[in-house]
């Protein structure tokens, strides 16, 4: 029978062997963890060094821009790179290391830093308008021909630019007495140096955004009608003897009036201008080609009202002439 003292010695030796085994495994794992940690710290130190150099370079660039009068702050201040690892149980001398990705908070902070460091000029494309000589000449000619000062032209020339495009946009404001249906919008007429064309013309309109590229001038249709009542009344009478050009111009006038449901009895007479002729001819062509007259016609026939007014004027003139003759005979 084995004595108890020998059993104690054998147990002690076995415990020492187990302790030595675990000590060896733990020391090996510490060496592996130490090397991994050192590599991680080396990587972070390189990243910090690159960030420091980039900050120095960007600071010099910002100083140069400040000297030139361009203030912009684009310093990089990203959060610390977060790489952590967790070791599993040691099995057969192998150590598995898991790297965690950055958390949501760190990602959000990094994105906020990137958005703050962006150049605000890249985020908004702002083009300062530059007035052109073409727009100034056009407004001057318009004011001279029509005979009245167009309000807001000085501020309009400062706030709108044509970007070297020799085309400008005229927005036609119809009189308040005209009730235009909702499905028909007012026409924007593009003015060139030599002719005028409609914005909706597919042959002369390479871009649908010509209105944003040119200068916009407000033209009141009521003023054009007021300035040309005599021309209208004379040319609507077919029996009067006028030249072909004047008669053609009267037809253009009538085409417009037939499409506008308004009473022109309150229009005052004035002289005719070349600019008004150009506008009226352009609107007439637009009405012939693009707008159906039935959609704009009213229950009251404008032609009939004009002819009635002409007959009333003639009757008054006849009555006055008869009265004068009777006075002379007496």
Swiss-Prot record:
What is one term from the GO cellular component aspect held by the record?
membrane
Kindly state which keywords UniProt assigns to this record, in alphabetical order. Answer: Glycoprotein, Membrane, Transmembrane, Transmembrane helix
Q: What is its main location?
A: membrane
Localisation: Membrane
Domain of life of the organism encoding this protein: Viruses
| Residue spans crossing the bilayer | 2-22
Q: Which residues are glycosylated?
A: 72, 94, 234, 315
- Its membrane topology: Single-pass membrane protein
**This chain belongs to which protein, by name?**
Uncharacterized protein L487
């Amino acid at each position: 029978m084995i004595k108890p003292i020998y059993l104690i010695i054998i147990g002690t030796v076995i415990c020492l062997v187990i302790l030595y085994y675990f000590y060896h495994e733990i020391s090996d794992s510490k060496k592996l963890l130490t090397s991994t940690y050192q590599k991680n710290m080396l990587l972070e130190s390189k990243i910090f060094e690159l960030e420091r150099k980039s900050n120095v370079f960007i600071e010099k660039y910002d100083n140069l821009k400040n000297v030139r009068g361009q203030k912009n702050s684009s310093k990089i201040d990203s959060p610390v790179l977060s790489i952590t690892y967790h070791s599993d149980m040691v099995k057969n001398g192998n150590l598995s290391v898991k790297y965690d990705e950055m958390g949501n908070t760190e990602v959000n902070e990094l994105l906020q830093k990137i958005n703050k460091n962006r150049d605000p000029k890249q985020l908004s494309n702002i083009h300062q308008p530059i007035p052109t000589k073409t727009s100034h000449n056009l407004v001057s000619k318009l004011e001279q021909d029509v005979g009245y000062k167009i309000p807001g032209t000085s501020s309009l020339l400062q706030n709108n630019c044509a970007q070297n495009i020799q085309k400008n946009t005229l927005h036609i404001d119809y009189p308040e007495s005209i009730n235009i249906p909702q499905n028909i919008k007012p026409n924007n007429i593009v003015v060139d140096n030599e002719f005028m064309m409609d914005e909706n013309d597919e042959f002369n309109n390479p871009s649908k955004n010509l209105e944003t590229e040119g200068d916009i001038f407000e033209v009141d249709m009521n003023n054009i009608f007021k300035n040309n009542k005599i021309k209208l009344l004379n040319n609507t009478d077919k029996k009067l003897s006028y030249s072909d050009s004047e008669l053609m111009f009267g037809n253009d006038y009538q085409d417009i009036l037939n499409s506008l449901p308004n009473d022109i009895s309150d229009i005052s007479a004035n002289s005719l201008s070349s600019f008004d002729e150009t506008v009226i001819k352009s609107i007439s062509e637009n009405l012939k080609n693009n707008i159906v007259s039935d959609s704009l016609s009213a229950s009251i026939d404008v032609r009939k009202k004009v002819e009635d007014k002409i007959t009333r004027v003639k009757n008054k003139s006849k009555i006055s002439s008869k009265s004068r003759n009777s006075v002379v005979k007496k």
